[in-house]
Amino acid sequence: MRKGVPKDPEIADLFYKDDPEEIFVGLHEIGHGSFGAVYFATNSHTNEVVAVKKMSYSGKQTNEKWQDIIKEVKFLQQLKHPNTIEYKGCYLKEHTAWLVMEYCLGSASDMLEVHKKPLQEVEIAAITHGALQGLAYLHSHCKIHRDIKAGNILLTEPGQVKLADFGSASIVSPANSFVGTPYWMAPEVILAMDEGQYDGKVDVWSLGITCIELAERKPPLFNMNAMSALYHIAQNDSPTLQSNEWSDSFRGFVDYCLQKIPQERPSSADLLRHDFVRRDRPPRVLIDLIQRTKDAVRELDNLQYRKMKKILFQETRNGPLTESQEEEEDSEHGSNLSRKMDSLGSNHSIPSMSVSTGSQSSSVSSMQEVLDESSPELVMMHSDESTVNSTSSVVQKKDHVFIRDEVGHRDRRPEVRPTQSVQNQALHYRNRERFATIKSASLVTRQIHEHEQENELREQMSGYKRMRRQHQKQLIALENKLKAEMDEHRLKLQKEVETHANNSSIELEKLAKKQVAVMEKEAKTAAADEKKFQQQILAQQKKDMATFLESQKKQYKLCKEKIKEEMNEDHSTPKKEKQERISKHKENLQHTQAEEEAHLLSQQRLYYDKNCRFFKRKTMIKRHELEQQNIREELNKKRTQKEMEHAMLIRHDESTRELEYRQLHTLQKLRMDLIRLQHQTELENQLEYNKRRERELHRKHFMELRQQPKNLKAMEMQIKKQFQDTCKVQTKQYKALKNHQLEVTPKSEHKTILKSLKDEQTRKLAILAEQYEQSINEMMASQALRRDEAQEAECQALRLQLQQEMELLNAYQSKIKMQTEAQHERELQKLEQRVSLRRAHLEQKIEEELAALQKERSERIKFLLERQEREIETFDMESLRMGFGNLVTLDYPKEDYR
């Protein structure tokens, strides 16, 4: 994707497709920062006044800048609250994002710069209350601003407080990035990479620092190097309000915000219930403050405009002003401004605790507006009268007119054209009157100038922030990589466990199927054996019955023949009676044989049933033995599988333990490497800062040395003038004395007296000349000594300050190193405890599973034996009911059924 032409539809939807240069007109720069510039503009379609923040995403770190823009746009789109800046849209134009927001008059910081004194406590309370409401809204949606300061708290014409500049904001809470402005950073943000995450309470800390800023014009440690301030904040106690004249409620509020430990620090919602922001205050307190500030800004701009106008007139007519004229102009207007500022400004009695850099460098020599070059001979005339159009929030001048310089037509000399920079400045101050603001033109100019001058320091700080963020990204990337590796490892182990469980289940299913097949086979075999056994018995009984019938038949024949023989021998019995007796004897014999046959059949049936019953009992016992064998085989298989599973789990635990220790070592090694790199960078930055400060001091001393001859010449001229005055006095005295002596002495002695007086005059002048030379020499020596002493004192003070900052850096780095080592030790102990606890849980689980398996084994075997015992008992009871008696002792030949 080429930046500026996003191909991702989701990203493309964040930006409007229109050309911003056609929509927004009349752009005037009203602010400047590391991101770029903020402009006042008018929407040509709706005539709405807006603020345009231009952010370039070309050059170095293009992708990082682009991602920051996307993040800020997404963040702004989600905001909808009276105390957050209203988002209007974002446009892309030639690798520059035009972020359009509602226009505000300026920031709380601008008020401090305009009035050059702290705000009143009631004004601070009103601003803080509005900022807190915005923060509470952000924090309730798990968002963090991360760059709260007076410069990012804006005010609108009706006195509404707005949070702005969400370039450092975090959409998620907690976060762990090193972002923000050094002097306002909370300790946990500075230590974010070293100690972990932070939440919305970092904004509460920054708000407390902002309260001190509004009360003392500058945040704590502002006179310190920004890097050194970071080290100071990270390891020293929280700052407090310096003056005792503030109320206890305000002091308590600031102390409450600046609790060092985040857990003890209140949330933004808690602070909204604090007496400092809840107490009564005039409803128009901010509106009045804004109006006073606007009046003061207008007076400042008018003063600068009059200066530029006079320079224009002077350059047009006679060339540049002399230095003395400039000083007179400055002193005159300065005294007027001072008197007016005293009447307009805040009347708080607390003095400023630090010197504003703005008061030292309110230069107007680098204004960037362009004067219309088509009228080089025109001179602007300015009226002091102005009105504020409250409906359009635009301040308009009544009497801006142009007249032609008549002097230029009368004077035939070549005219001197005003310099372009002076024209630019004059038009800049004139054009500013077209919109309402509480930021003076000199402040805008100074911001631009400082942005250009402090590029090296800003690059160093941004490079340091970038390095910290890069380190954080490296740690997060490594953590994600290690987490992915651990997840992959655990997934692999889980698959192995699942594979083992599946294989075990399959093996048990196979075993169950095999046992079922064996049981079915045994059942079929038993049924076949039983059938064969029955057939054998029946065949034998059939054979026995045939033998028995044959025997009966033979016996019947024998008996019949025997009876016949007996009857034949008995001749006395009648034949009829013999026949009857033979028939009866046959019947008896047949009856006896029938009874014997029936008895044999009964014996055979009993034998058959009893032996079949006994065979069934043996078959059942054999089946029981097979069931016992099967359950023992199944339980043994389960135990073997469980033991294999336990061995695998122990192996997994050991491999996981080894991986965890290796990953912890890798993470800690990277963290220590990054800390060493960070400390090395911090040391290099500090050394570079020290060299820069020494160079600046050396340059200052060199300039003083170059300036020294001029100063000495002036002082020498002053001494010479004093000498000349003394000489004149002595000459007058000599003349008076000479006249007096000539009048009171005879004329004959005049020559001697004149010679004597001449010698005395020569002697005194010689002494005076000697004194003059001695004064010159003493003055030069004194000035040189004073200069050397002052420069040496400055060098000594600088060395002491730099040494203290270096010691502060060393202490900070030592603390960070000790904290990191302690953190690593805690992580190692935590890992050891986790590993030990996990191993104990695993061993307990193994023990419990083995006990459960043994219990299952005992219960299943017991249940099987009881079932089999009940089955045999039921079978034997049924056998008894069938009259078979005890079948256990039945052991006789199959043929012995009689």
UniProtKB/Swiss-Prot annotation:
One of its GO biological process terms is: regulation of MAPK cascade
Name the membrane topology term. Answer: Peripheral membrane protein
* Catalytic function, reaction form: L-seryl-[protein] + ATP = O-phospho-L-seryl-[protein] + ADP + H(+); L-threonyl-[protein] + ATP = O-phospho-L-threonyl-[protein] + ADP + H(+)
The Protein kinase domain covers: 24-277
Presence of keyword Nuclease: no
Q: Where is this region: Disordered?
A: 316-374, 565-596
Q: Which UniProt keywords apply?
A: ATP-binding, Cell membrane, Coiled coil, Cytoplasm, DNA damage, DNA repair, Kinase, Lipid droplet, Membrane, Nucleotide-binding, Serine/threonine-protein kinase, Transferase
- Which Gene3D superfamilies would you find in this protein's record? Phosphorylase Kinase, domain 1 (3.30.200.20), Transferase(Phosphotransferase) domain 1 (1.10.510.10)
Show the ranges annotated as biased composition (Polar residues): 334-351
Q: Per the record, GO CC terms? A: cytoplasm
**The protein's Enzyme Commission number:** 2.7.11.1
Enzymatic class:
transferase
- Where is the protein found, in the record's own terms? Cytoplasm; Cell membrane; Membrane raft; Lipid droplet
Q: Which GO terms describe its molecular function?
A: ATP binding; protein serine kinase activity; protein serine/threonine kinase activity; transferase activity
The positions annotated for binding ATP are: 30-38, 53
Family of the protein in this entry: Belongs to the protein kinase superfamily. STE Ser/Thr protein kinase family. STE20 subfamily.
Q: What is this protein called?
A: Serine/threonine-protein kinase TAO3
